[in-house]
Amino acid sequence: MVKIKICGITRLSDALDACFAGADALGFNFSSKSPRAIAPERAKEIIEKLPPFVESTGIFVDQSPEEINALCQYCRLQIAQLHSEQYSPEQARSITAAKVIKVFRPEENFAVEEVFAFAQNSGINAFLFDAYRPGMAGGTGETIEASLATRIFNELGNSCYAILAGGLNATNVGEAIRRIQPYGVDTASGVESRPGIKDSREIRSFVKAVHHGGH
């Protein structure tokens, strides 16, 4: 079954709505430039109240590996998502407080050899692919061009855990799953009423669409 991450959580009520709807993971954005940014203290409070079997993910754009390790320990994050091109394989390997997901924002000429090289040099086996938009690290609401996403995921095969993000919502996620067959899907803006504020009905609709699309 395709895994589901609801990203950009800023409120406990939204976190619990996502959990009870069937999300497998929640994302907390620690980039101060994001409209979905959350303070570590608030993230910790929310994570402490989550039910078991739901993983908490920290989204990091400009923190050092040392800062990431400290935040993962403080907030009890299970996953560190490196949402920036600045992180090298060596830096990723030095993050030991949580499992690491490396994000790529592919353009038309993207070569999957970049993924293979990063995996080999870092030991990471989970990668997320988000839509590319100059000057923005994610949460744009834009989708990856369909043929590009299909090519990348086909070429990756079963070499890693590949997660699809970028403009996914209840309307388009089912078709994306059938076409691309990702390990998991990730959405933020696709289940919001405004940045950082989730819509419980949209969350339920998204989860339902994922489950239907995966069959």
UniProtKB/Swiss-Prot annotation:
One of its GO terms (molecular function) is phosphoribosylanthranilate isomerase activity. It comes from Chlorobium phaeobacteroides (strain DSM 266 / SMG 266 / 2430). Transmembrane segments: none annotated. HAMAP family: PRAI. It catalyses: N-(5-phospho-beta-D-ribosyl)anthranilate = 1-(2-carboxyphenylamino)-1-deoxy-D-ribulose 5-phosphate. Pathway: Amino-acid biosynthesis; L-tryptophan biosynthesis; L-tryptophan from chorismate: step 3/5. This is N-(5'-phosphoribosyl)anthranilate isomerase. The keyword ATP-binding does not apply. One of its GO terms (biological process) is L-tryptophan biosynthetic process. InterPro entries: Aldolase_TIM, PRAI_dom, RibuloseP-bd_barrel, TrpF_fam. It holds the Pfam family PRAI. Its EC number is 5.3.1.24. Belongs to the TrpF family. Keywords: Amino-acid biosynthesis, Aromatic amino acid biosynthesis, Isomerase, Tryptophan biosynthesis. It comes from the Bacteria. The keyword Protein biosynthesis does not apply.
